[in-house]
Structures are given as structure tokens and as C-alpha cells.
């Protein structure tokens, strides 16, 4: 069975350990729901240095490209920041379905 791609977004807190743990849990939930999750925060920081302006821009471009290839945008968490708003706007413009996760299912 081919799983549709689900782009995972959230207003990440900025603490790498916390963000990675939450992202992995969100991805697991999307996987269990039948999707192939795509979550750039899980791997882009491994090779993109956001302190370098060109790399920061390239990271944004890569995230947008991944979102464009996705079938659904999954918005996670209770907060919405500018990155999440931008993801929602891109998804809307491209007619990509957007949904949220039931956060009561996440156990921290």
C-alpha cells in the first residue's frame, strides 16, 4: 500500500532535544494514521546551519519543496507561529489538505 506524504509542522520551541522528541512522536502518529510523514526539523539541522544566511534560505526552500510534494499538511501543537502560518498559506494556495493532530494522544 502506498502511503500519502504528510508534511509535519509545528511551532517548535527551539530546544533541539524537545523539538526532536515531539517531532518523532508527531511522525509516529501520522505513520500510524496511514501516512508517510515528512518532518524537516528531524534532519535539516544535521546539515543546514541556520546561522549562515544562504543556508537558512536554502533550508526554507527545501522545506517548501517538501510541502509542495505532500498530500496533506499536519499542523501539530497548540501554538501557531509565522512558520506554521506560512506552511498553511502555501498549502491553501496549492490546494493541499490541512489537518491537525489530536494532542491528547501525545504523552510527554
Residue ranges and their predicted role:
Residues 66, 103-104:
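Short, highly charged low-complexity linear segments
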Residues 106-108:
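Conserved small/polar residues in nucleotide/adenosyl-binding loops
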Amino acid at each position: 500500500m502506498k502511503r500519502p506524504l504528510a508534511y509535519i509542522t509545528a511551532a517548535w520551541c527551539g530546544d533541539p532535544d524537545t523539538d526532536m522528541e515531539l517531532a518523532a512522536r508527531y511522525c509516529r502518529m501520522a505513520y500510524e494514521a496511514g501516512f508517510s510523514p515528512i518532518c524537516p526539523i528531524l534532519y535539516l539541522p544535521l546539515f543546514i546551519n541556520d546561522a549562515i544566511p544562504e543556508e537558512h534560505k536554502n533550508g526554507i526552500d527545501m522545506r517548501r519543496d517538501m510541502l509542495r510534494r505532500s498530500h496533506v499538511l499536519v499542523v501539530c501543537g497548540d501554538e501557531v507561529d509565522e512558520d506554521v502560518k506560512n506552511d498553511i498559506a502555501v498549502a491553501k494556495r496549492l490546494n493541499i489538505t490541512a489537518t491537525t493532530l489530536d494532542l491528547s494522544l501525545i504523552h510527554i
